[in-house]
A protein has these predicted regions:
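Charged helix-capping and loop-helix junction motifs
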Residues: 281-289, 320-325
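Active-site segments of SGNH/GDSL-like serine hydrolases
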Residues: 268-272, 293-324
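Bacterial Sec-dependent N-terminal signal peptides
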Residues: 1-30
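Serine-esterase "nucleophile elbow" of acetyl-processing enzymes
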Residues: 25, 163-239, 252-261
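Solvent-exposed loop/turn segments at secondary-structure junctions
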Residues: 198-202, 241-247, 271-276, 309-314, ...
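Proline-aspartate-enriched helix->loop->beta-strand connector
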Residues: 257, 261-267, 299
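Catalytic His-Asp segment of secreted/periplasmic serine-dependent ester chemistry enzymes
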Residues: 308-381
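Extended beta-strand solenoid/passenger and fiber regions
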Residues: 26-167
């Protein structure tokens, strides 16, 4: 593999940091339940674009030019609660915050945590809190520890009536995923396999990080809701491995995925490919190779292809991720649909900060953005 424009040592580092915790794929068919007592998975899986009440939207309060920014996705008609993202504290209206012009405003005497913009990019290396920046000689704030969830806040609010989501919305795929939908509706056995990198493995979601509110990975959230709606006969296996690219997925598909005899495979490579500047045509060929290899053995298998979320533009991981969505669209056909998380994330970034939606400030989603992954994919099913 040739990495264009990036030092090989740095590439080794950036692929290593996403494998700090584990490189093992999930091998069990169970879903952790530690979230009970903190959150409702029914509320967490309700599509943001349909909900009147937005539950636990994440904000990273950010002081920019002396003003603390707190950007909600939608204007609010009422704010119901404001908490630390790790559920360690709830803040008081009139003391810590107020609603002004449809947005959350932090009051001067508030104890709500915040970051200064100047803390995001810096020159001096900070042990355990640094990643190479895209600009040579810089670093970006980064950690795989549950640091950001102690600084981010979650806001539950009632959306103003005229507020609408203007981004990508999935359509029920009864025509494009006919076999999977038919099995779900008739309550036949359905095997789902997840295949990808650290994002698909669930890195930086709160249960993965062993911190409240212990939200399951977005893959687990999908299975939870499918079982709730269609029945317990749905099985799954998560074969995602941190740090991997689509070329690895193609090389390993025969030994890793095909033996699972999946009815539906959800494929999510692209983040690491984009960091390594893998050409668009090569990326498409690798994904196509995965699909063809599986269909050769299991012709009725269907696929959901996920275009990658975007990396922090200040981090060295920021590459050509945004161009892969159009390549995946070229593979769409009956039995293959594309979940455009690239467009979803881009639309979110028109209204919110990158730090509102990240678990490591480089290339992993927090619970909030992970919920978008689950909701978008569930929208097809």
């Amino acid at each position: 593999m040739t990495f264009i424009g990036i030092d090989k040592t740095i590439i080794t580092i950036l692929l290593f940091v996403v494998m700090i915790e584990s490189t093992r794929a999930q091998t069990t068919d169970t879903i952790a339940t530690r979230w009970r007592g903190y959150i409702s998975l029914d509320q967490y899986s309700k599509p943001f674009w349909r909900a009147d009440t937005i539950v636990d939207e994440t904000i990273q309060p950010m002081r920019i030019n002396g003003k603390i920014n707190t950007n909600l996705l939608f204007k609010a008609s009422a704010i119901l609660s404001v908490k630390v993202a790790n559920y360690s504290k709830e803040f008081i209206q009139g003391k810590d915050w107020e609603l002004k012009d449809g947005q959350l405003k932090i009051l001067p005497q508030s104890t709500i945590p915040f970051l200064d913009k100047e803390e995001l990019v810096f020159k001096a290396f900070k042990p355990e809190f640094s990643m190479h920046g895209k600009v040579p000689g810089t670093h970006v704030l980064f950690t795989e520890k549950p640091y950001f969830s102690s600084l981010q806040i979650i806001v539950t609010y009632i959306k103003a009536k005229d507020e609408k989501w203007k981004g990508f919305v999935p359509a029920f795929a009864n025509r494009n995923l006919p076999s999977s939908i038919a099995k779900l509706k008739s309550k036949q056995n359905l095997k789902v396999v997840f295949y990808g990198n650290s994002i698909e493995a669930g890195y930086n979601t709160s249960n993965f990080m062993n911190t409240p509110p212990y939200m399951p990975t977005w893959a687990d959230l999908i299975i939870y809701k499918l079982r709730q709606h269609y029945g317990p006969q749905i099985s799954f296996s998560n074969k995602a491995v941190a740090g991997k690219m689509a070329s690895w997925g193609r090389e390993q598909v025969n030994s890793v995925v095909i033996p699972e005899k999946a009815d539906l495979v959800i494929i999510g490579f692209g983040m690491n490919d984009g960091s390594a500047h893998v050409p668009a045509e090569t990326f498409r060929s690798d994904i196509d190779g995965i699909i063809r290899a599986i269909k050769k053995q299991n012709p009725k298998t269907e696929f959901i292809l996920i275009s990658p979320m975007l990396p922090n533009p200040d981090a060295i991981q920021s590459g050509i991720q945004s161009i892969y969505q159009s390549e995946l669209n070229k593979l769409a056909e009956k039995g293959v649909v594309v979940a455009d998380m690239t467009a979803v994330h881009a639309e979110l970034l028109r209204h919110k900060l990158y730090q509102d939606m990240t678990g490591n400030n480089v290339n992993h989603p927090n619970d909030y953005l992970a919920r978008w992954y689950a909701q978008i994919i569930l929208g097809f099913l």
